[in-house]
C-alpha cells in the first residue's frame, strides 16, 4: 500500500506551531508531507517571525497531487492570504470534489468560508475567528478543541496543534499509528 500524502499550504503570516507541529507529527506517522509555499519556494516569514523553507512551490506541488489531506495552518495574515488565493480555492474545490480530507486550524477555517468549502459542516476555530466564520448560516459551530465532520477537520489554535495533527494521523492511517506516534511525545492526557 502506498503511503498517504499530505499537502500543507504555507502562506506568509502563517502560525508557526500550527504549521510545524502537524508536519512533524504526520511525518512521524509515515505520511509523505509536502510543505508548499503559496508564493513560491522562497522561505516564508510566519506570524512570530520564524522563517520556514517550503519543500516546493504550491504551483509545483499541485502537479504532484492528488493528496489524501490538504492542511491549512492559521495565523490571521496567513489565513487571509489563503482566503485571497485563487490557487488555494482551486485545490480545495478539487479536494472536496474528490472527497479528500481537508484540515484547517485556528483562523485557517476562514479560508474554507472564503472559498465556499464544506458548507453545512460543524466546525471550530480560534475564538477570535468565530464571528467571521459564523457570518451567515454556512456552518454550525463547535467549542470542541478538534472537530471532525465528514471530510472537514478543524481545530482551535496553537495549543491544539498536537491534537489536530494526531487526529489527521488517526483519520489517514488509523488510531493505532496515532497512539504509537503520541506515546513518545510525552503529551498531557
Swiss-Prot record:
Active site: 106 (nucleophile), 126
Disulfide bonds: none
UniProtKB keywords: Acetylation, Autophagy, Cell membrane, Chaperone, Copper, Cytoplasm, Endoplasmic reticulum, Fertilization, Hydrolase, Inflammatory response, Isopeptide bond, Lipoprotein, Membrane, Mitochondrion, Nucleus, Oxidation, Palmitate, Phosphoprotein, Protease, RNA-binding, Stress response, Tumor suppressor, Ubl conjugation, Zymogen
Encoding gene, per UniProt annotation: PARK7
Molecular-function annotations in GO: copper ion binding; cupric ion binding; cuprous ion binding; cytokine binding; glyoxalase (glycolic acid-forming) activity; kinase binding; L-dopa decarboxylase activator activity; mercury ion binding
Catalytic activity: N(omega)-(1-hydroxy-2-oxopropyl)-L-arginyl-[protein] + H2O = lactate + L-arginyl-[protein] + H(+); N(6)-(1-hydroxy-2-oxopropyl)-L-lysyl-[protein] + H2O = lactate + L-lysyl-[protein] + H(+); S-(1-hydroxy-2-oxopropyl)-L-cysteinyl-[protein] + H2O = lactate + L-cysteinyl-[protein] + H(+); N(omega)-(1-hydroxy-2-oxoethyl)-L-arginyl-[protein] + H2O = L-arginyl-[protein] + glycolate + H(+)
Main localization (coarse): membrane
Record-listed cross-link Glycyl lysine isopeptide (Lys-Gly) (interchain with G-Cter in SUMO), residues: 130
Keyword RNA-binding annotated: yes
Lineage: Eukaryota, Metazoa, Chordata, Craniata, Vertebrata
Role played: Multifunctional protein with controversial molecular function which plays an important role in cell protection against oxidative stress and cell death acting as oxidative stress sensor and redox-sensitive chaperone and protease. It is involved in neuroprotective mechanisms like the stabilization of NFE2L2 and PINK1 proteins, male fertility as a positive regulator of androgen signaling pathway as well as cell growth and transformation through, for instance, the modulation of NF-kappa-B signaling pathway.
Protein name: Parkinson disease protein 7 homolog
Major enzyme class: hydrolase
Amino acid at each position: 500500500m502506498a503511503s498517504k500524502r499530505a499537502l500543507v499550504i504555507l502562506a506568509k503570516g502563517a502560525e508557526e506551531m500550527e504549521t510545524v507541529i502537524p508536519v512533524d507529527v504526520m511525518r512521524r506517522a509515515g505520511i509523505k508531507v509536502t510543505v508548499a509555499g503559496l508564493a513560491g519556494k522562497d522561505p516564508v516569514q510566519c506570524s512570530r517571525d520564524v522563517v520556514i523553507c517550503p519543500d516546493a512551490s504550491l504551483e509545483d506541488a499541485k502537479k504532484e497531487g492528488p493528496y489524501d489531506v490538504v492542511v491549512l495552518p492559521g495565523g490571521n495574515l496567513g489565513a487571509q492570504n489563503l482566503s485571497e488565493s485563487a490557487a488555494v480555492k482551486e485545490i480545495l474545490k478539487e479536494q472536496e470534489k474528490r472527497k479528500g480530507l481537508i484540515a484547517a486550524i485556528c483562523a485557517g477555517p476562514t479560508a474554507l468560508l472564503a472559498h465556499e468549502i464544506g458548507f453545512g459542516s460543524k466546525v471550530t476555530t480560534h475564538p477570535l475567528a468565530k464571528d467571521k466564520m459564523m457570518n451567515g448560516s454556512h456552518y454550525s459551530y463547535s467549542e470542541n478543541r478538534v472537530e471532525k465532520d465528514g471530510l472537514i477537520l478543524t481545530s482551535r489554535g496553537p495549543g491544539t496543534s498536537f491534537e489536530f495533527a494526531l487526529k489527521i494521523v488517526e483519520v489517514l492511517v488509523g488510531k493505532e499509528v496515532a497512539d504509537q506516534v503520541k506515546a513518545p511525545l510525552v503529551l498531557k492526557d
